[in-house]
Every structure is written in structure tokens, then in C-alpha cells.
Amino acid sequence: FVKKYALEGKAEIGMHLHAWNNPPMYQLEVAQEGAPYLIEYPDDVMEAKIKFLTNLIFERTGIKPVSHRAGRWATNEKYFELLSKYGYVVDCSVTPHVDWKTSLGQTEGSCGSDYSSAKDKPYSIDTSNGSSVLEVPVTILRSHKLFLKTSSAKNLARSIWHAMKGTELWIRPNGDNLEEMKYVLDQTYVSDRDYAMFMIHSSELMPGGSPTFKDERSIEKLYKDLEALFAYASVKYEGIRLRDLSNGKESSANKRTL
């Protein structure tokens, strides 16, 4: 299904790896209740998993992936070195303003990556093998703006609390954040950032595929929000693939890329 659009330049097939169910299987010592990050595995196992999934994507689609996002957002120097080795030129795993250290891994002391001080615009990551990977961070806005949730007193209180302490706004639907996503698009457009990045898991597009969208009613609401969001975005943004960003492709006049 996706291959047709990828070949037409309307979509992109990238690589996204969750280490615990990606061959070859390898048993880590279990010391914590979190799911294991790829960066917890020995270097040779990390490489074998990346090689396996990269080859599988090519075998199934005939397309060599060059873009990547890490499972559970975790990266390190070795990870980028291996991505470069297997032909990846662009990554989108960095989540500015977000610290994942409370998201535990499986081995003793393991946790997620801390991106709280990360750049929010594209930058090059040099690797030890002399090559580089373009990092295109996820669009996340730190904000104190109050978005009133009138559906219940509980939601109203939560909105006020988030505005007081500040919160991270993503272009990531949760069933109740259409206005927030539009706000991020608007703020990004008037900033010095030349793209906005939307994200969603494919499992979230079906009833019961995630804790966020548990039934058909919530999925219908999701699709209505997506239609409204992309209609709104299309006025000031145009779609682009990560591989095109890495090649320096520019957006049309007066438009940003999404």
C-alpha cells in the first residue's frame, strides 16, 4: 500500500525499531520492569537488529530506507554510527524539552534519553566513522498558554495546572488537543523554524490499538481531528519527506514544510 506512494514521492518508508521484538532475539538481564531500549544491547546485537530490519524493508518494498526514528526515542553515539553505516542519512528521534529518564529500560540503571536541552532545529550529528546523520527534531513547543477544556471540571483544572507550570505541546493527536496542535503550527510558522513535524503511531489509527483510542467512537473523533488539522495546515504548509530535507529541498514561497 505505502510503496506506491513512496515511489511517487508522496510518502516515505523509514525504519523504526523496537528492540525487544526485532530479530535477532537476545535475552538481556532483567533488572527493571521497563521495555528494553536498543542501546541496552551489546554493540554487535544492536548492529544485527538494525541490519535485519533494514534488509527486511528493502526485501518487502524494494526501497532502501534512509530515514529513521528510534523506538522509545532512545539514541546514543553508537546508534548513530550504526545508522550511518547502514545508509541512513536522517533521523527524527530527538524530542526537544523532553527528558525520558523516568522511562525505565530493562537492565540495571537503564533509562531513556534526556533531550531537555536539545536543539529544536535540524543539525548534523558527526559519527566516529567520519560520516554524519542529519537530525530533524520532533516539533515540540514549551508553552504556558491556557487551553480551556470545558468537557468537565477535571479537564478544566488540568488545563489550568498545565498553563501554570508549563507543558510540552506536540503535533500529536490525543483525542482532545486539536486547538493545541493548531497553535503549535501557528507558532512554528512565525518562528525561525522552517518545518513542523506531525507524529502518530500506526497502531493508534485503529480501535483498541492504543490506550489513547480505545473504541470506534474515539477513532472517528481522531479522523475528524486529522482532517481538520491537515486542512488547517495546508494553508501555510506543504508536505515533504525526511529524505528530501536531507537533500536540501526547499519549500514553496511563503510556505513551511510538514
Where are these regions (language model features)?
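Histidine/acidic-residue-rich catalytic or RNA/ligand-binding cores of hydrolases
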Residues: 24-25, 102-107, 147-149, 207-214
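C-terminal domain-boundary segment and adjacent tail
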Residues: 159-258
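The substrate-binding groove and active-site-proximal loops of carbohydrate-active enzymes
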Residues: 34-45, 64-71, 109-110, 166-176, ...
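Hydrophobic faces of well-ordered beta-strands that scaffold small-molecule active sites
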Residues: 13-17, 66-68, 90-92, 134-136, ...
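Metal-dependent polysaccharide deacetylase catalytic core of the NodB/CE4 family, i.e.
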Residues: 1-70, 74, 131, 142, ...
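Active-site-adjacent pocket scaffolds in enzyme catalytic domains
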Residues: 70-191
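Short, solvent-exposed loop/turn segments at secondary-structure junctions
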Residues: 19-22, 72-75, 95-98, 140-143, ...
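Short, electropositive alpha-helical surface patch
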Residues: 1-7, 76-89, 253-258
